[in-house]
Amino acid sequence: MKEAKFIFVTGGVVSSLGKGLVASSVGALLQAHGFKVRIRKLDPYLNIDPGTMSPTQHGEVFVTEDGAETDLDLGHYERFTGIKATKDDNITTGKMYHELLKKERRGDYLGKTVQVIPHVTDLIKSFIFNGTEGLDFVICEIGGTVGDIESQPFLEAIRQISYKLGKQRVILIHLTLVPYLAVAQELKTKPTQHSVRELNFVGLQPDIILCRSEKEISDNQRGKIANLCNVSLSNVISAPDVSHIYELPVLYNQCGLGTQVLEHFHLSKPKPSLVGWNQIVHSMRHPMQEVTVSIVGKYTEFPDTYKSLVEALSHSAISNRIEVKINWVNSREKSGKPINEKFMGDKLKNSHAILVPGGFGDDGIEGKMLAISYARTNNIPFFGICLGMQLAVIEFARNVIKFKDVHSEEFYTCKHPIIKLAGDKNVDLGGTMRLGAYKCNISPNSKMAGAYSDTIISERHRHRYIINLDYKDDLEKNGLICSGMSEDGTYIEAVELENHPWFIGVQFHPEFQSKPFSPHPLFVSFIKAVVNKVKKTEG
């Protein structure tokens, strides 16, 4: 039985350098060579998971098929490799200590003093080794930055694994910043040297150094890093900025990253087939048309909050050979300026389509409903996701059905609670979600059925509140069709407006299943509707 090899990806100097994209790109390259891979994320923070963390702190919460709330990097892993992540592919320090303390309370440690070494590090190693049978490579991204106190148990676990398995089964890729100083007009390698010394201090030596920078790093600078960091010149690889993340597998292949990984393990494989990636890059660089989609939300200053959403739009744009320009519209009041109908209209007047994404809390919801009303009354393609769908229902009930006191139980007590809580109110915040993949029945002859070319689908969910079934008849007799229902018929999963070019709201998150090689059918249909609108307008 073959034994998996382990690739560890660490980062130095600063965070947000793109370790997740490096791990994803390496996974894609190894797949192109014919290997079976899996990618995992080890996060040093003390939260159990990112489910209750602020989007401004952490960015998007990516939901897996089996209902885990995970780091947004798992979305990159899925999109680059096509492999569905699971709850076993993301661990946090908080989850580790939670498990450790449960074991201690059960008496599993038989009265021993419970310590970081060996007990925490043993749990980390168990997570890394779990479920690796039949795989060629397991890629593990270590969150945070080398030198952070929170990362030390993870680095110690990697050191122990490296010592036990040896170079024949372990490689360490270190991603580091090589900043450009405009005053000196040169790239500075000193931060990289210090970062590698931090690794050396905990007993680790990188095998490959990836140098992130604004521009290409010269051979002289690479040689300096190689000499001072004890890494061969061929393993010091320049990683300059790119215009789009899907250029990375092609770039890293050209830089020899995949080749160096295989040479480290003394493996020889045919030249990788990157035809698909090259086609994607070509489509992105040579769009035939440009359209503008407005995303109306309250975290528009933090685009990572909507990472999968933006990527799903990108995938559908690639498949339609167009470029999607995003117009970010904040739905909250700013600087004392009220967001009224005129204000929102001015923000949206140059948009070809409007999308209202998911979210929580009542902050900014009136602004979102103004955007929904604008799309509905002006026949502009509209896509509402999760909260976006719920607000579309409330706006419709207010302005079409003419209910006087209608809202969501999430925000207000009202006469017509058209949106209600799905489950038990007396549960911890992190335990009240409807999470993961659920089947949905689609009405034949609906726009939803046309988009999917199917009437039974499975989509990922992350929500507490649902459309109140008591109002289904009111909605439908006024023209808002409930075109998607849960398998058991208890949840309204999708609505669409009659006599509108494209007005669809869904309770689930289709963006989590979209990939560059298989764009999500709803996003493809949405963008096609946008293109058709532009043709009619310009024709």
UniProtKB/Swiss-Prot annotation:
Gene3D superfamilies: 3.40.50.880, P-loop containing nucleotide triphosphate hydrolases. Keywords: ATP-binding, Glutamine amidotransferase, Ligase, Magnesium, Metal-binding, Nucleotide-binding, Pyrimidine biosynthesis. SUPFAM superfamilies: Class I glutamine amidotransferase-like, P-loop containing nucleoside triphosphate hydrolases. Pathway: Pyrimidine metabolism; CTP biosynthesis via de novo pathway; CTP from UDP: step 2/2. GO terms for cellular component: cytosol. InterPro entries: Class_I_gatase-like, CTP_synthase, CTP_synthase_N, GATASE, GATase1_CTP_Synthase, P-loop_NTPase. The active site is at C386 (nucleophile), H509, E511. Residues 1-267 are annotated as: Amidoligase domain. GO terms for molecular function: ATP binding; CTP synthase activity; glutaminase activity; identical protein binding; metal ion binding. UTP binds at S15, K188, T189, K190, P191, T192, Q193, K224. Its EC number is 6.3.4.2. It catalyses: UTP + L-glutamine + ATP + H2O = CTP + L-glutamate + ADP + phosphate + 2 H(+); L-glutamine + H2O = L-glutamate + NH4(+); UTP + NH4(+) + ATP = CTP + ADP + phosphate + 2 H(+). CTP binds at S15, D148, I149, E150, K188, T189, K190, P191, T192, Q193, K224. Homotetramer. PANTHER family: CTP SYNTHASE (PTHR11550), CTP SYNTHASE-RELATED (PTHR11550:SF0). Catalyzes the ATP-dependent amination of UTP to CTP with either L-glutamine or ammonia as the source of nitrogen. Regulates intracellular CTP levels through interactions with the four ribonucleotide triphosphates. This is CTP synthase. It comes from Wolbachia sp. subsp. Brugia malayi (strain TRS). The gene is pyrG.
